[in-house]
Amino acid sequence: TYGDGVSDVDINALYEFHKKNGRRATMSAVKPDSRFGVLDLSNENEVKAFREKSDIDSGWINAGFMVLEPKVLDYVKDDTIMFEREPMEQLAKEGQIMCWKHNGFWQCMDTLRDKEKLEKLWSTNKAPWKVWKD
């Protein structure tokens, strides 16, 4: 996962979906009301392409929670590669990424406003991502 997203993604369900689909990569996807690049998906949830989101677009985005087969590391040639670009786009071209759609809570924390929103949810005991017992 990326370090800037908070979610109640069911990791076990994501992993089980990955095991069943037989692809090299499975990414979680969410449909937020915001400003992210969009995933173009087939009817079977295969990732076909990545594109920048327009003001009128409301597509699925990469939620950052992924299951990857070790072979995916072969797509990373050196430490200058942006993982979201070359490796993931190549996997999509090869039909090797599936998407697991998450309809639960997801929130990025890219801005101070995002941070304050998440802190308010936490401090008022309304944090949907807190799925464990104290």
What do the predicted segments below correspond to?
Residues T1-G3:
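Active-site acidic Asp-centered loop
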Residues S42:
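Extended acidic/charged loop-beta regions that coordinate divalent cations
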Residues V6, I11, Y15-K19, P32-S34, ...:
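Catalytic-core segments of class I nucleotidyltransferases/pyrophosphorylases
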Residues N21-K31:
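A short, conserved acidic/glycine-rich loop-to-beta-strand motif
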